[in-house]
Amino acid sequence: MSCTIEKILTDAKTLLERLREHDAAAESLVDQSAALHRRVAAMREAGTALPDQYQEDASDMKDMSKYKPHILLSQENTQIRDLQQENRELWISLEEHQDALELIMSKYRKQMLQLMVAKKAVDAEPVLKAHQSHSAEIESQIDRICEMGEVMRKAVQVDDDQFCKIQEKLAQLELENKELRELLSISSESLQARKENSMDTASQAIK
């Protein structure tokens, strides 16, 4: 009987050590997730500032588009795509952390069940309390990760909407630039025709 109890206690200690390792891994994942959340918030602020920046620089872009329209449009499109790509990478990383936490929680429940079965002959109340405490904490952490994932989805949706609006503005600027060039070409041709008519009239007057 003493051998059986000693074996049960040894198994319990081993399981508790594994639980501590899982807790440490979960805390590390939560820290990484918090860092991702801060980056997401920074990205959202940057995304919100984009429309104001484009409104302030709209007139400057219109003037500059007369000289270097293709270069400017290419630069703006590259910056927007880089922001969207970074947002998507953050979102994927966040989902990977969420999956890892859920896997840890599943293993944690399995080990706690094994511990409870092995300790039927021993008072299980402290183990139950520890299980309830750790389970509630890890589930709370998973809820936080889910909330962060939802924030990321909304941020990516906002970025996509802003990208479409900016694309429309850039297309409008290209059209205006083309029309201005056509007007300039027509004005130049008209001026040249008037100059030639004036020269012909002067030549006839001299004769």
Curated annotation (Swiss-Prot):
Primary location: cytoplasm
Keywords attached to this entry: Coiled coil, Cytoplasm
Keyword Nucleus: no
Gene Ontology MF annotations: protein kinase binding; protein-macromolecule adaptor activity; small GTPase binding
Any Gene Ontology biological process: negative regulation of hippo signaling
Compartments, as annotated in UniProt: Cytoplasm
SUPFAM superfamilies named in the record: Spectrin repeat
Tissue: Widely expressed. Expressed in brain, heart, skeletal muscle, colon, thymus, spleen, kidney, liver, small intestine, placenta, lung and leukocytes. Present in all cell lines tested (at protein level).
InterPro entries registered for this protein in UniProt: SIKE
Top-level taxon of the source organism: Eukaryota
UniProt xrefs under Pfam families: SIKE
GO CC annotations, alphabetized: cytosol; FAR/SIN/STRIPAK complex
Coiled-coil intervals, chain numbering: 70-102, 162-193
Outcome of substituting residue 19 to D: Loss of interaction with SLMAP
Alphabetized PANTHER family for the sequence: SIKE FAMILY MEMBER, SUPPRESSOR OF IKBKE 1
Subunit structure as annotated in this protein's UniProt entry: Interacts with IKBKE and TBK1 via its coiled coil region. Interaction with TBK1 is disrupted upon viral infection or TLR3 stimulation. Interacts with CDC42BPB. Interacts with SIKE1 which mediates association with the STRIPAK core complex composed of PP2A catalytic and scaffolding subunits, the striatins (PP2A regulatory subunits), the striatin-associated proteins MOB4, STRIP1 and STRIP2, PDCD10 and members of the STE20 kinases, such as STK24 and STK26.
Family: Belongs to the SIKE family.
The protein's role, per its UniProt record: Physiological suppressor of IKK-epsilon and TBK1 that plays an inhibitory role in virus- and TLR3-triggered IRF3. Inhibits TLR3-mediated activation of interferon-stimulated response elements (ISRE) and the IFN-beta promoter. May act by disrupting the interactions of IKBKE or TBK1 with TICAM1/TRIF, IRF3 and RIGI. Does not inhibit NF-kappa-B activation pathways. Associates with the striatin-interacting phosphatase and kinase (STRIPAK) core complex, forming the extended (SIKE1:SLMAP)STRIPAK complex.
The protein, known as: Suppressor of IKBKE 1
Species: Homo sapiens (Human)
Lineage, uppermost ranks: Eukaryota, Metazoa, Chordata, Craniata, Vertebrata
